[in-house]
Amino acid sequence: MTVTNRMEIESAYHKGEGFRSYYIQKIEELQLVVAEKHQNLRRLQAQRNELNAKVRMLREELQLLQEQGSYVGEVVKPMDKKKVLVKVHPEGKFVVDLDKNIDINDVTPNCRVALRNESYTLHKILPNKVDPLVSLMMVEKVPDSTYEMVGGLDKQIKEIKEVIELPVKHPELFDALGIAQPKGVLLYGPPGTGKTLLARAVAHHTECTFIRVSGSELVQKFIGEGSRMVRELFVMAREHAPSIIFMDEIDSIGSSRIESGSGGDSEVQRTMLELLNQLDGFEATKNIKVIMATNRIDILDPALLRPGRIDRKIEFPPPNEEARLDILKIHSRKMNLTRGINLRKIAELMPGASGAEVKGVCTEAGMYALRERRVHVTQEDFEMAVAKVMQKDSEKNMSIKKLWK
């Protein structure tokens, strides 16, 4: 092979390599363009799907807006697998058919349903209507009070455990004995003796839904509003069972009925009658317990206090000396006290004081120490606090300079 031929071959080879690298570069560029187009296509497909979803939603809303309104009724009872007796106000009661998407097992008495306007067919089950004021009565967070925070009420704690805590945690014991579970308990006694505190402790230990309502909240100015709130209160308690309904100041609606021409008194009596009806209506095995508290048991209606509605009445007397000492120990547990403080002597200085007043003595003693810029509480602070809270004559002899130093 001559030199000329070799040079021609090498020249052709280099030309071929140049073409190859050129086309490879072009192919890579086109692949990048194709990848970018695919990415744009996927993005456009996602946008299309999102727009289609919005279109479907708008069409459904438009269809709902174009539909005729439905009647709202309340189920009385199911008649058979395809028929239900429904009460519609004010028309009356109707036996209606079920829509194909409604299961007869989901249709229970007293539930709210929607009926078609033209055929009265039951086509939707509605949620129960609850007044916002009633829903606010349910305490979302379980109270942090415990039995250890209640001093001097060992007998009362034992009795309320038997009535409220034991049926919720161990209902089989009542079934074994063949006795009915207690429905409710009444806590009565002077103000500040620990009725509300013990109710909160029960809710903490039973881990139940705690519904707290004051009797004055059920007194409404419009006729029938208070009765409706009582009904919705028990409906909410059944939905969130096991639950405890704590009614404080029950004497505001549960006082003895008298003949009066006042419309306000009549409305309060209607509210109490609805409460009596609800106490008779719900079963004790439904894990709904009622705790009532009052400091005026003498004015309560006898119908409210009879067994079967209120099965146990627990008295909260003013604490004796030992009980006051226990309360002082509980509330001074976290206080920074000096050595040698005689809490028994402090308890002896408060004859007839309530538990709230004993707690107030601890708070006032801390305020006296704070007033003098001290980080500890002394015996003298407690004695001055007792004199102030109990309003004794010794308060007049205290040094003004000592008080306002």
Swiss-Prot record:
This entry carries the following GO cellular component terms, namely: cytoplasm; cytosol; nucleoplasm; nucleus; proteasome regulatory particle; proteasome regulatory particle, base subcomplex
InterPro entries found in the cross-reference section: 26S_Proteasome_ATPase, AAA+_ATPase, AAA_lid_3, ATPase_AAA_core, ATPase_AAA_CS, NA-bd_OB-fold, P-loop_NTPase, Prot_ATP_ID_OB_2nd
- A GO molecular-function term, please? proteasome-activating activity
Write down a Pfam family by its short name.
Prot_ATP_ID_OB_C
Instruction: Provide the binding site for ATP.
Output: 189-196
Which GO BP terms, alphabetically? proteasome-mediated ubiquitin-dependent protein catabolic process
The signal peptide, as residue positions, is none
Question: SUPFAM superfamilies recorded for this chain?
Answer: P-loop containing nucleoside triphosphate hydrolases
- Family annotation (CDD domains): RecA-like_PAN_like
Q: Where in the cell is it found?
A: Cytoplasm; Nucleus
List the keywords (alphabetical): ATP-binding, Cytoplasm, Nucleotide-binding, Nucleus, Proteasome
The record's similarity note reads:
Belongs to the AAA ATPase family.
Quaternary organization: Component of the 19S proteasome regulatory particle complex. The 26S proteasome consists of a 20S proteasome core and two 19S regulatory subunits. Interacts with Rpn6. Interacts with imd and Usp2 isoform A.
The entry's function note states: The 26S proteasome is involved in the ATP-dependent degradation of ubiquitinated proteins. The regulatory (or ATPase) complex confers ATP dependency and substrate specificity to the 26S complex.
Q: What's the protein name? A: 26S proteasome regulatory subunit 8
Q: State the organism of origin.
A: Drosophila melanogaster
